[in-house]
């Protein structure tokens, strides 16, 4: 009977404890201990970063890698995460960083992330990630395929506009020439009509 209350308390604590990550769910090359996933100092980049982590992860360590951004939705898929260690990474604060900036903006505490700074591009170099406005991040975006496509479309429209303007100028010049010729012919016909009676009268005078 004496062990009954202690057994009940132990069972309750076991039920309340967060589930640990099975070894099979621990992504390579990280190491896992309980709900802690340690991927720090593994030389990870955007391309080599694991695409997913155990859903019960409460602490994620990504410190000391070569990460310039995180894939969209990576942290949002971990609702149990209380802390993500992201320091000592060369964060590039452009379009790719928008998801991470949004995730940081939604954290109740920003103090653990105040050492995160932008390394590039030059416009935002040295700025603190948690206090970076989304407009600042988007303004630093390099032109993507859509931007280049829109630019090409604008240039094509500009070229068509210039071509139409050139054709219009040529048409106006042609019309002016035709009008000038018509006026010249009209003046010549008028002169001819005025000189014909004089010639006829002169011929009649000569005959008499």
UniProtKB/Swiss-Prot annotation:
Signal listed as a keyword = yes
Q: Where in the cell is it found?
A: Membrane
Q: Name one GO biological process term.
A: cell adhesion
Instruction: Name the domain of life.
Output: Eukaryota
The UniProt entry, under Gene3D superfamilies, shows:
Ribonuclease Inhibitor
An additional note in the Swiss-Prot or TrEMBL entry is: Platelet activation apparently involves disruption of the macromolecular complex of GP-Ib with the platelet glycoprotein IX (GP-IX) and dissociation of GP-Ib from the actin-binding protein.
What name does the UniProt record give this protein? Platelet glycoprotein Ib beta chain
